Amino acid sequence: LLTKHIKKNIKDIPQIYVPYKEAMDVYENGLHVPEDITLVWVDDNYGYMKRVSNPKEQKRRGHSGVYYHLSYLGAPHDYLWLNTTPPVLMYEELMKSYNTGADRYWLLNVGDIKPMELGIKTFFDLAWNVDAYNIQNINNHQSKFLGHLFGEAYTSRFQNILDTYYQLAWSRKPEFMGWEREWDTKEY
């Protein structure tokens, strides 16, 4: 179908396979994905990569990529309005993926753009130049950006605010407040 409509050799047409949710089960149970197709690994919708390429997959011609969430709509609870993924967590998980071959394709699910602006900036800057960041400087990335926008003199104040915000928001996402019901797979 692709060859017919794009009029190129199938191996010259960039393609991805995203083993997300049910598709992960199919892949894990033996689905053959051609070598030139990029495997795009997904986080668990809460910032932790569910899987990265194993040594055999790292040798694939199609390499691998990541699909990362700053926003999520789905069960058991969605979070759509606030960016609560700490930059250090994003860095650790994306570098874990990058270091196992995820260098071909990075996708970020953001939902509403404006409240996710700092997370988007962190993700894009890291994707553009992974070597510019490390575990010591990634946490200051967002406060430096805000300092650049609003005045360098405020950078340390922004950092204190962001540190407190991420600590509180990560302990329990604000969108989850008021949800006291636990997820019961038998019920759903």
Where are the predicted features?
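C-terminal non-catalytic alpha-helical accessory regions
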Residues: Q142-Y188
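Ser/Thr/Asn(+Pro)-rich, low-complexity disordered segments
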Residues: L1-N9, M24, I135-N140, K144-L149
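Catalytic-core region of carbohydrate-active enzymes that cleave or remodel glycosidic bonds
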Residues: W81-L108, T122-Y133
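Conserved, mostly hydrophobic/aromatic
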Residues: L39, S97, N109, F145
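Aromatic/acidic polysaccharide-binding cleft in carbohydrate-active enzymes
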Residues: L107-A132, F176-M177, E182, K186
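Gly/Pro-rich turn-and-neighbor structural signature
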Residues: L1-R61, L168-R181, T185-Y188
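Flexible loop/turn segments at secondary-structure boundaries
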Residues: E22-Y27, Y46-M49, K56, Y72-H77, ...
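Active-site clefts of carbohydrate-active enzymes
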Residues: R61-P87
